[in-house]
Amino acid sequence: MEEFLTVGLWGGEGGDRWSFVVNNGGIIGMEIVHANGIASITFKCGDEYGVLQHSRKFGGTGEGWKTDKISLNWPEEYLTSISGTVADLWQHIIIRSISFKTNKGTEYGPYGVVTGQPFSYSTEGGVIVGFHGRSGTLLDAIGAYVKIPQKKDNTLKMALPVPRGPGPWGGHGGMEWDDGVFPAIRELHLYVGDSVIHAIRVSYQSKDGEPLLSPKHGGEGGEPIDPIKLEVSKEFLIRIAGFYGPVEGSGSFKALRSITFYTNKAKYGPYGDEIGQAFTSSVAPGRVVGFHGRSGAYLDAIGVHMEYF
């Protein structure tokens, strides 16, 4: 089974969950219905034999709204970036605008109205091969699936999405993220300052033994600590623990205030200040094989995927 990164979701919590991913081939077209926001999106894909496949329409009809179509010259041209904005429309948080970019530098959009909270994701050598989201009468939320190239690259990405492990623990702000699961965790990179965890970035190991670096989950603040480096043949994570609570100067906004990592060999941390509500992952025999959580300006929440012995 091919490995790919799950990116997002961005948007509201209305509507029903949906998912569309290309198994063989690539995305060759999209149809977007939009006006004051995004009413719906439809995908078209093709393979090397010219067989075409259309997704269902994700969203409503958008009666009277404008329809735009995107055509890509796959396999020479493929999607590498998605961006947009999220805001309220008719008392519902939805995708208000959306844009796409390809490996050729061509930009499509923005479609809809550029207003509200921005979001964006751009691959570093990967290919967007599908999307997931929420929709009802409008496009409530959207995320993407990114395929990992077959060539070796020490900054590329993730694995197949899986059911959630324990957690996440923390606040409810920011955007949801999920790295998936991996054979091993190689390094942990933390950004800490002002008694709060600003961000985390994880270096995993692929099934081929190659390092795969996750996106940076969190904001640009904080100072980087020395990376936690694990000798994967001998050392593995078994548990995380920490504290979360309101961030000073941010009212009731909650984020991770402290985090500690436990391996079968050692304890790393605590990093940050042990203030607020304590949490810990399972102490049952097993190992951590991935992380998920929420992030924005800070690392709002974190959880783990476990492989139990």
From Swiss-Prot:
InterPro entries: Jacalin-like_lectin_dom (IPR001229), Jacalin-like_lectin_dom_plant (IPR033734), Jacalin-like_lectin_dom_sf (IPR036404). Belongs to the jacalin lectin family. It comes from Castanea crenata. The modification N-acetylmethionine is found at residue 1. This is Agglutinin. It comes from the Eukaryota. Disulfide bonds: none annotated. D-mannose/D-glucose-binding lectin. Binds N-linked high-mannose-type glycans. Has a preference for smaller (Man(2)-Man(6)) high-mannose-type glycans to larger (Man(7)-Man(9)) ones. Recognizes both alpha1-6 extended and alpha1-3 extended monoantennary glycans. The addition of alpha1-2Man to the Man-alpha1-3Man-beta branch results in a significant loss of affinity, but beta1-2GlcNAc has some affinity. Has less affinity for biantennary glycans, and affinity is very weak for the biantennary complex-type N-glycans with bisecting GlcNAc. No affinity is observed for tri- and tetra-antennary glycans. PANTHER family: JACALIN-RELATED LECTIN 11-RELATED, JACALIN-RELATED LECTIN 3. Residues 4-148, 163-308 form the Jacalin-type lectin domain. GO terms for molecular function: cell adhesion molecule binding; chitin binding; D-glucose binding; D-mannose binding; oligosaccharide binding; polysaccharide binding. It holds the Pfam family Jacalin. Keywords: Acetylation, Chitin-binding, Hemagglutinin, Lectin, Mannose-binding, Mitogen, Repeat. GO terms for biological process: heterophilic cell-cell adhesion via plasma membrane cell adhesion molecules; positive regulation of cell division; positive regulation of mitotic nuclear division. The keyword Repeat applies. The keyword Repeat applies.
